[in-house]
């Protein structure tokens, strides 16, 4: 098994291309993050919406209404199906988290950056066994990750969901999440492999999608549920990055909503 198959990462050159195309937000140490993050989110699926809008002009008003109704019904059926015991990825909601929004948080290039090459200022060095040989993984923590996770744990039911393998991601999360913010951890086997990408299907969690949000640096990860997503720029080693710090007030605003679709839609509005 190759090193690259253990950790699922964004490439630095891909992140630069996406940033230039407006597919992800770019943080600035001088400006607080506000509603602009959600404008970036809309850009992620601009092409998809253009295709849909061009074809929708051929629909009658009645057909459009039926399409919306079918979409709502499908979402409802998916949610009800995963309420059947043993079919959902997450355990029952604890008493502590009753009524809270479930926030699904990615690991690599969202909270940390890891490398098999030595990093002088690594926050963690994690041994990972690959085909009988132990390799060292050097892990950098994104700036303000501790403050971000602490606040998220106070407000939400937090779930780690990574496309990396558990043999790497589990020990990294042990070191990163000292306070036990994550109620559950999901790894690659919980993803859906779709068109060459590991997709995090939120409908399989067993949570109401109206009260579920995903934070991820890869739009492909949430392609099934773009309207539940808060995008974040891929992080590699910029120690001046303030993305997580600037996201705290955004999530504080979301924490009191009963419908993330409505709240995220309002925040995306110009």
UniProtKB/Swiss-Prot annotation:
EC number: 3.1.3.16
Gene3D superfamilies: HAD superfamily/HAD-like
A Pfam family that the UniProt record links to this protein: NIF
Catalytic residues (positions): 106 (4-aspartylphosphate intermediate), 108 (proton donor)
Any one Gene Ontology BP term: negative regulation of G1/S transition of mitotic cell cycle
PROSITE patterns, alphabetized: FCP1 (PS50969)
Residues flagged as site, Transition state stabilizer: 162, 200
Keyword line: Hydrolase, Magnesium, Metal-binding, Nucleus, Phosphoprotein, Protein phosphatase
UniProt cofactor(s): Mg(2+)
List of residues binding Mg(2+): 106, 108, 217
Tissue expression profile of the protein: Expression is restricted to non-neuronal tissues.
Compartment(s): Nucleus
Cofactor note: Binds 1 Mg(2+) ion per monomer.
Reactions accelerated catalytically: O-phospho-L-seryl-[protein] + H2O = L-seryl-[protein] + phosphate; O-phospho-L-threonyl-[protein] + H2O = L-threonyl-[protein] + phosphate
One Gene Ontology cellular component annotation held by this UniProt entry: nucleus
Cited InterPro entries: Dullard_phosphatase, FCP1_dom, HAD-like_sf, HAD_sf, RNA_Pol_CTD_Phosphatase, TIM50
Phosphoserine carried by residues: 5
Oligomeric and partner information: Monomer. Interacts with REST.
NCBIfam families per UniProt: HIF-SF_euk (TIGR02251)
Name of the protein described by the UniProt record: Carboxy-terminal domain RNA polymerase II polypeptide A small phosphatase 2
Species assigned in the record: Mus musculus
